[in-house]
Amino acid sequence: MRQTTTTPAARSAITAAIVTLAGIVLSGPVSLALVNALHPQPPWTGPEAFARAYHPIQTLPYFTGFLLVGGAVYLVAALQTLAGDAHRVRATAGLAFASAFAALIAFNYVVQTTFVPALAANYSPESAPLIAAFSLSNPRALGWALEMWGYGALGVATWMVAPVLADHGRAGRTAAALFVANGPVSIAGALLTALRPGWVMTPAGLGLFAAWNLLMLVMVALVIAAFRLSADARCISRSARE
């Protein structure tokens, strides 16, 4: 039986959505604005130039990105718990894809916050290939493959758990539609990265990155609205019966 919007799982979904929302805002516009204002990293020309321009504040988007990762997995887990029998298997598959997302992105952010900074701070010609391979400043780095395929896995996860939201009012139905849309959008981004490495740092890639951030913001905001409005409606109905 599907759990109601007043269960701990529903409250967890709201909390997870708030954490995810904070992660999107802090790791995206807030962190990027601070980095660009204080110590921007110039366009990639090579590992040596990257090391010269490196500053610890450039890791801020990745540290705050852990909020997004944790919040997103927590949200999918909460929705899987709320799934009724008809959607339980699908939602459980979504949780598995969310776990794959977390593994890929968390590994990438550990590399960006710990491994790459150590290489840049103690730069030597021997470390140049590793910086080029992993730093997200390099549009053709392995880091971008991890990033895009990781978020592709999250897209599959949101696609899978979307039906859980559909019976939580208008906000829930809209959120479900956006959760579904995030699936092919994220998968397309991963495939494009495989076919055209480096596209993420082109004007089109940066524009799509901004659009995806907006999509994610609206998605998680609607989750908060859906569960809060649904819970309020249940409280009003209960009061009326009393």
Regions found by a protein language model. Give the residues of each.
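Hydrophobic, aromatic-enriched alpha-helical segments typical of multi-pass transmembrane helices
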Residues: 2-242
